[in-house]
Amino acid sequence: MKYGIVGYSGRMGQEIQKVFSEKGHELVLKVDVNGKEIKDSPDVIVDFSSADALPETVDLCRKYKSALVLGTTALKEEHFEMLRELSKEVPVVQSYNFSIGINVLKRFLSELSKVLSDWDVEIVEAHHRFKKDAPSGTAILLKNALGKEVPIHSLRIGGIPGDHVIVFGNVGETIEIKHRAISRTVFAIGALKAAEFLVGREPGFYSFEEIVFGGE
């Protein structure tokens, strides 16, 4: 598989390159703040950079007919409209979190929330000091899985890759569910799974959850 990375010089870009290369895939396109380096047409482009970079990423996908794996957070409706239009031409997958564990947790929470519908519930998320958006896209993803408005408490401290705690409370008892990303490698592994899934697929807007659960 030939692939490209938008945000190549960033922390996630470097992690993606490492994980993809270990599987024998060929990096043929690099994009970062210093410009572009293109060797060949990529089968898939992976972008974990910033929402501001999305228009250029979409243009590259159209130019090379590349599938898109998008892990950028803080997207607005205008960005989703761009993705919907692009998905008519190439396969696209977008997620605020490419951890397999988070996507399993998301499905679990949607069921648990039905059983504990009268319980209080809040979310606490912590990330490294350089993360710009708060609450995190993952916290919003988990809130949406709960199916109701819940308070989200955000911490930006140190070098934490990503902690998410969901606390359910009732009179006399609490349930705490925690997911911790130990390193950024988990997100790169998820991006690889998504990229390998998309190559050769028909155009469309795919979810990472359906990739994790085999199209259920």
UniProtKB/Swiss-Prot annotation:
Pathway: Amino-acid biosynthesis; L-lysine biosynthesis via DAP pathway; (S)-tetrahydrodipicolinate from L-aspartate: step 4/4. It catalyses: (S)-2,3,4,5-tetrahydrodipicolinate + NAD(+) + H2O = (2S,4S)-4-hydroxy-2,3,4,5-tetrahydrodipicolinate + NADH + H(+); (S)-2,3,4,5-tetrahydrodipicolinate + NADP(+) + H2O = (2S,4S)-4-hydroxy-2,3,4,5-tetrahydrodipicolinate + NADPH + H(+). Transmembrane segments: none annotated. NAD(+) binds at residues 7-12, 71-73, 95-98. The active site is at 127 (proton donor/acceptor), 131 (proton donor). (S)-2,3,4,5-tetrahydrodipicolinate binds at residues 128, 137-138. It is an enzyme of class 1 (oxidoreductase). Pfam families: DapB_C (PF05173), DapB_N (PF01113). It is found in: Cytoplasm. InterPro entries: DapB_C, DapB_N, DapB_N_CS, DHDPR_bac, NAD(P)-bd_dom_sf. GO terms for cellular component: cytosol. Keywords: Amino-acid biosynthesis, Cytoplasm, Diaminopimelate biosynthesis, Lysine biosynthesis, NAD, NADP, Oxidoreductase. Its EC number is 1.17.1.8. GO terms for molecular function: 4-hydroxy-tetrahydrodipicolinate reductase; NAD binding; NADP binding; oxidoreductase activity, acting on CH or CH2 groups, NAD or NADP as acceptor. Belongs to the DapB family. Catalyzes the conversion of 4-hydroxy-tetrahydrodipicolinate (HTPA) to tetrahydrodipicolinate. HAMAP family: DapB. This is 4-hydroxy-tetrahydrodipicolinate reductase.
